[in-house]
Every structure is written in C-alpha cells, then in structure tokens.
C-alpha cells in the first residue's frame, strides 16, 4: 500500500477534513464579527459525492482517521449523510469530528447511532457568562447536557478543547474548575495555545499566554506526563491517579512541535493543505468528479508531500494562507 510520507520521514495517517467554512458562533479569537463569505472565492463547498470519492482514495493511502471539521460541520444539512457514507463505504477505520456543540443535546443519539468514533467539543470556559461573551451564545448548559447524553450512551472518546486566553481562563482557579469537571468523567480536556492567524494579530498580542503556566500547574499538582509512540501527534498528555479524565496541552509555539506532525488538511472547497499555516495549497477537486479519477487523485496527493516544510514557522509570525481557523478546519 502507498503511504503518505514526507521528506522528513513523517507519516500522515490522519486527515482533518473541513466540510464547511460556515460557523454560527462569534468566538472572539476566530470570527468575532461572525461568519462572512469570502467574496474572492466563489467556489461552493464540496458535495457529498465528492467527499465520498475523496475518502475512498485516502483509504488507499493508509489514512486510518478522518476528523470532520469546519466551520461548524453540523450546519450542513447533509452532515449525517456524509457521516453515514464515510462509516459504511470508505474503509476509514476511525471517523471523528470537532464541533462547537450547539446542537449536541439534540443530535448526540444520532451521532452514536451513525457510528461516530470520537468527538472534540469546544468549551473555552465553564462559567456560563464567560462562555456567552466568548462565543456570542448562551449554550453552555445545552452542551454539557449533550455530553451527559453521550456518556449515558457509553460513548467513549470525548474530548473537550479550550483555547488558553490571558485573563479569561488562565488562573489556577480556572484550571481547578476544569479539573473538577474531569475528576469523575472520562473526558480528555486539552488546552490549546492561542495561535496567530492572518486577521487576529492585535487580539493575539493582547490575549496570548504560554501554555507553560498550565504545565507548571499540572506539575505542581502531581499530574504525570503520559508518553505515546512517535506517531501519536503533538499533544502532551497528563494523567492523575485520582482523576478519571486526562489533561492535554497543545503548544504550537513550543520547540520541535512539528516533529510529531501526523496530519494533513483538506478544505471545504477541495484544497489540499500540507500545513495549517502553510503558504501553499493545491486544488484536488477536479479529480473528485468521477470514480475513474481515483488513481490520478492518489498520485497527485503523493506528489505534493515533498513540499511539506519541516516547521510551520509560527514563532516567526508566519501565518500562511490561514486568515482565520474556520477557513482551514483548525
């Protein structure tokens, strides 16, 4: 089997597949003014049949995990059709999703029934008012209800992501609140460092804080760093004997962050992106129009990997093509 391997020996069994740029939230660090269509890009989002052809080709390249992202993937009316086809026909062993959770309490049972293998839910604060200020929506209680429903269904792979923000969720009291949340819940909670994108420089300068503050808290409170294989990805994971859940840290500005990169990205309009913050992307959509194009599609993807750089160079202020995280499925 052909596999996705770059010139630095990194393998890419994991694809983050955006199926829409649209998001109904107004998160302060991503889309503070809400979603606005890019007038310079008139292309539609990939159709269900195009996504189906894409995932079948990816399965022949050793891809074993696809994460559906956006925007907010569940705003697509055919979201469950896409999920169902991917689970039944693509030969991809693991299909997961990232969501803001706005419909989670209503669709949790369907997600379970359709065979979703894992879910990442964005919750930047467990304080209802703070959550509302950050997202523009007073939906925290509904999201927590959705998580509870998933747990009652014995849904195992639940992760909660929070962007670490200065003065908002970066105190020991905040960390303890999240710790209490996972103490008796088998949930992986991960803090993600705020990343600079093309349109958030001022916000980044004001609100970025190093994840070291959280790692120091974990060390002080006897959390144990958990190590995995070299293909496990860039997250640092921590366990504690008194907690059912786990803590994680994603620190893109840390040294050697890109050494363990194991993923590629495909945008909702069918562009292959080798890096979230890369300067290059190539459209593969023209090879998603007919089943007979699969071999050509496989070859095109393979031939792009030599262009993948060793690092994202975020520390140099390079944000590449990423205007905001909704456009590339952060």
State the predicted function of each range.
Residues 1-14, 183-184, 194-330:
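Auxiliary Fe-S-binding modules of radical SAM enzymes
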Residues 7-46, 276:
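Canonical Radical SAM [4Fe-4S] cluster-binding loop centered on the CxxxCxxC motif
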Residues 19, 189, 270:
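Residue-level signature of catalytic and energy-coupling elements of molecular machines
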Residues 25, 128-129, 256, 282:
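Glycine-centered loop/turn positions within well-structured domains
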Residues 26, 30, 76, 129, ...:
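Residues that scaffold the ATP/ADP-binding catalytic core of kinase and kinase-like folds
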Residues 26, 70, 269-270:
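Residue-level recognition of short loop/turn positions
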Residues 36-41, 127-134, 198-202, 283-284:
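A short acidic, helix-capping loop that chelates divalent metal ions and anchors anionic groups
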Residues 45-68, 72-192:
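Radical SAM/AdoMet-radical enzyme domain recognition
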